[in-house]
Curated annotation (Swiss-Prot):
Subcellular localization, as worded in the UniProt entry: Mitochondrion
Any one of the GO BP annotations: glycine decarboxylation via glycine cleavage system
Reactions this protein catalyses: N(6)-[(R)-S(8)-aminomethyldihydrolipoyl]-L-lysyl-[protein] + (6S)-5,6,7,8-tetrahydrofolate = N(6)-[(R)-dihydrolipoyl]-L-lysyl-[protein] + (6R)-5,10-methylene-5,6,7,8-tetrahydrofolate + NH4(+)
Known role: The glycine cleavage system catalyzes the degradation of glycine.
Assembly and oligomerization: The glycine cleavage system is composed of four proteins: P, T, L and H.
Organism: Gallus gallus
Name by which UniProt lists this protein: Aminomethyltransferase, mitochondrial
Family statement: Belongs to the GcvT family.
Keywords: Aminotransferase, Mitochondrion, Transferase, Transit peptide
Residue range of the transit peptide in the UniProt record, numbered on this chain: 1-16
GO CC annotation, single: mitochondrion
Amino acid sequence: MLRAGCRAALARRHLSSAPEGLKQTPLDALHRARGGRMVPFAGWSLPVQYGRGHLESHLHTRRHCSLFDVSHMLQTRVYGRDRVRFLESLVVGDIAELRPGQGTLTLLTNERGDIVDDLIVTNTAEDHLYVVSNAGCADKDRAVMEGRAAELRAAGGDVHLEVSGQRAAGVQGPSMAQVLQAGLPDDLTKLTFMTSTATTVFGVPGCRVTRCGYTGEDGVEISVPAGRAVELAERLLGCPEVWPAGLAARDSLRLEAGLCLYGNDIDESTTPVEAGLLWTLGKRRRTAMDFPGAAIIMEQVKEKPKRKRVGLTSVGPPLRPPAAILGPEGTPVGTVTSGCPSPSLGKNIAMGYVQAAHSRPGTTLTVEVRKKQHPALVTKMPFVPTHYYMAK
């Protein structure tokens, strides 16, 4: 039931309806050879799970280590002396304060204060910023960035964008450091959460290793030359600790960690304040109010939002979007945006938006599932402890 439920949820929420014209990652043949069940996702063909199933894959990642194909993510390099000014004209984060090799999660916003995408931006030790965007937002993000870059250049600014041909793999789980250190010339203990380095990985040069991920575990994402991606993946999967993992495990892992999925939990109808992502707003940026939608966002900070993103736990049938969340009087107070049975906890977890008056952890609400009402408890996120390798 768990595995079938997660597969069905992925199909409903993220997958396109037809396989024609799908892009393939360099690891496509490897996935198929290892029993990956391929599905369409954001215009790409990607594995949803492997023969061992979603439950085993999820738990293996929590206990050991898994390899995820994230080649569908858009990777962009931003060059030029005005690259920081360019990016800060689009996002809410303090890019200027990033040290060489340091990155941050930030939000691309519009003039209404809505979230256009969530990005990871790294100030590389080289001469550029490295930006990773969601695959489903790739065309939109490119148009926004290229449009703004053209405006800056027309005004005499120096900025240039280069879409990277590199692909990417995520290595996630408590065994990651042991596995990866064997193939790195660098001391991995010096690479803390949200820092990045250009290096060679298991003999493959031209890689970028960033200590981050989408599971709540210690992990890295490796940007690798497309022509060497299979070689690197095979080296990693040659380690007994490393299993291949698919979209189903990635989704349940990120939900347990309380991480947002763009298009479900955040989109162009939500603001950073409503989403509980106020921490992404740099202190200097709040004062300067020089990012898109700043007036609206800072007004919400002052007056408090009318709705908030919350976590929910329940027993019984899984809570799936767009299930209605009901208050004590049986009136609608919100909507579920993500949900699945938690392999780690053995109960249902979900996130959604509710009226602010009903957002306090410990509040009992009701969720309507197949025309029946089931109790759900507002629960603090993350649902399971995270294990990021933080700087001491």
